[in-house]
């Protein structure tokens, strides 16, 4: 269920801000979005998996907090990130 190392490295390389960046808010949001998408597909196949549903809701909450941080500190980067990840945001 977790991301493969290659997938994770590919996401980090495409969303990092500089060469050694592996943990910026943008990278964390991109990794969480990938895991959220995988878990959503799992829950469509297994609708009674309530523990995974709770984990999904926790990931969505963490991603929301990170997005709020990015929006507060850098609105331009926030809009670009939301567009690249196809995340709906309130106006």
UniProtKB/Swiss-Prot annotation:
Family under the similarity heading: Belongs to the universal ribosomal protein uS15 family.
Protein's recorded name: Small ribosomal subunit protein uS15
Protein origin, superkingdom: Bacteria
The protein's role, per its UniProt record: One of the primary rRNA binding proteins, it binds directly to 16S rRNA where it helps nucleate assembly of the platform of the 30S subunit by binding and bridging several RNA helices of the 16S rRNA. Forms an intersubunit bridge (bridge B4) with the 23S rRNA of the 50S subunit in the ribosome.
Assembly behavior: Part of the 30S ribosomal subunit. Forms a bridge to the 50S subunit in the 70S ribosome, contacting the 23S rRNA.
Pfam family, one: Ribosomal_S15
GO biological process terms, semicolon-separated: translation
Gene: rpsO
CDD domains associated with the record: Ribosomal_S15p_S13e (cd00353)
GO cellular component, one term: cytosolic small ribosomal subunit
Annotated keywords: Ribonucleoprotein, Ribosomal protein, RNA-binding, rRNA-binding
InterPro entries in the record: Ribosomal_uS15 (IPR000589), Ribosomal_uS15_bac-type (IPR005290), uS15_NS1_RNA-bd_sf (IPR009068)
Molecular function via GO: rRNA binding; structural constituent of ribosome
């Amino acid at each position: 269920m977790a991301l493969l190392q290659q997938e994770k490295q590919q996401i980090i390389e495409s969303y990092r801000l500089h060469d050694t960046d592996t943990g910026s808010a943008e990278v964390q949001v991109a990794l969480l979005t990938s895991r959220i998408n995988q878990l959503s597909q799992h829950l469509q196949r297994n609708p009674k998996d309530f523990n995974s549903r709770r984990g999904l809701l926790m990931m969505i909450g963490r991603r929301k907090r990170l997005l709020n941080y990015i929006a507060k500190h850098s609105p331009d980067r926030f809009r670009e990130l939301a567009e690249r990840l196809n995340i709906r945001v309130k106006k």
